[in-house]
Amino acid sequence: MSFNNQSIDQLHDFLVKKEISATELTKATLEDIHAREQAVGSFITISDEMAIAQAKEIDDKGIDADNVMSGIPLAVKDNISTKGILTTAASKMLYNYEPIFDATAVEKLYAKDMIVIGKANMDEFAMGGSTETSYFKKTNNAWDHSKVPGGSSGGSAAAVASGQVRLSLGSDTGGSIRQPASFNGIVGMKPTYGRVSRFGLFAFGSSLDQIGPMSQTVKENAQLLTVISGHDVRDSTSSERTVGDFTAKIGQDIQGMKIALPKEYLGEGIAQGVKETIIKAAKHLEKLGAVIEEVSLPHSKYGVAVYYIVASSEASSNLQRFDGIRYGYRTENYKNLDDIYVNTRSEGFGDEVKRRIMLGTFSLSSGYYDAYYKKAGQVRSLIIQDFEKVFADYDLILGPTAPTTAFDLDSLNHDPVAMYLADILTIPVNLAGLPGISIPAGFDQGLPVGMQLIGPKFSEETIYQVAAAFEATTDYHKQQPKIFGGEN
């Protein structure tokens, strides 16, 4: 029996009433995963035995009636450390790495008796927008297997969209949760920078990275964010702000709420079908009582250029630790220590990772630091100021999550600039450290279109309020791809 069409609340009710056990739910989820895995390719590792053992332990001590996540399985992106489960970051460099510790976010999952059922495929070290840079495999879009699932959290998104799991964790450095959520027609939240601990997340861009939830519905997304949020002394960038219940405002009306629609978000480069879908979604929010007004974010057009200097510079520094000496892949082709360093990194990293390391090293090098990295930091400040000006008068910002729907597999691999531009609407949110969500807002030629809602720092509850109001009065989130049993 499959339970993938049941909400988390419904599953919790079944578990509390002992209509099913955590073990039965886990086994059913594993059946769903294996039945769809060949078609979608969402996972690098499926931890059958460990997941069933965890479920049996939960059954033995009993389901906690006050903990809605007790006994619920989920997938975790493969750049988030999981003790005893291979964690590869989809790289040859870490093809056999089994961590001896859990990321803080994973510790919080276990503290709520959740079950990590496997590790989701991704772009190597989270560098990519299509999940095609993975060393292990390519993942297919749940709606059309000839399309990409987006990236870098493509496996996490495809697993939810295809009905393999109800929930997953991703990470978002420049759109890596929101863009694949849009491409696969699910809900994906990039929380405020510092909301979720980064301890145990393999660092890419340390000033940009955030772990976040991916789900079928807005409420489930909020429920999972409530679990993983909170201060962590092991992460100096972790916020000390008290974490409440992110579902608190779900169900409240949005009458009178002021929402800004930046003209740049519907300008050049945005596909006509996407543009029309977002305009329709904005009008729907107006019918629900929101006030939608056009604004300008004039420096957002520089976001991609700023991002690829800042993120690549941080990646260049963060990836220095992978040298063939301490852990991970080591070349067999060496005569001296220099050979170990050079050949290990040449053989262990893929082309996209090496491209970004070189770009970052160049940006930080003597004679170029001021012209590139320092200048990028100055423009980043202007992007932040643009958002602050808008949020002085508006509650939220809306727009498309991505400029297009999912593109063909292998279509942009030889055009990195075009691939980078796919994140033009999500990158500024990371540069400013803001929360942003993608929710299903419609379809263009049979492929999902996501609407992005952006708020001031620590406004996740308000974002969920508006997202849930839209979801409750539309049926886009209920439509499913054929692999999940839908008609599309």
UniProtKB/Swiss-Prot annotation:
Its EC number is 6.3.5.7. HAMAP family: GatA (MF_00120). It is an enzyme of class 6 (ligase). Heterotrimer of A, B and C subunits. SUPFAM superfamilies: Amidase signature (AS) enzymes. InterPro entries: Amidase (IPR000120), Amidase_CS (IPR020556), Amidase_dom (IPR023631), AS_sf (IPR036928), GatA (IPR004412). One of its GO terms (cellular component) is glutamyl-tRNA(Gln) amidotransferase complex. It holds the Pfam family Amidase. It catalyses: L-glutamyl-tRNA(Gln) + L-glutamine + ATP + H2O = L-glutaminyl-tRNA(Gln) + L-glutamate + ADP + phosphate + H(+). The active site is at 77 (charge relay system), 152 (charge relay system), 176 (acyl-ester intermediate). Keywords: ATP-binding, Ligase, Nucleotide-binding, Protein biosynthesis. GO terms for biological process: translation. It comes from the Bacteria. Coiled coil: none annotated. GO terms for molecular function: ATP binding; glutaminyl-tRNA synthase (glutamine-hydrolyzing) activity. This is Glutamyl-tRNA(Gln) amidotransferase subunit A. Allows the formation of correctly charged Gln-tRNA(Gln) through the transamidation of misacylated Glu-tRNA(Gln) in organisms which lack glutaminyl-tRNA synthetase. The reaction takes place in the presence of glutamine and ATP through an activated gamma-phospho-Glu-tRNA(Gln).
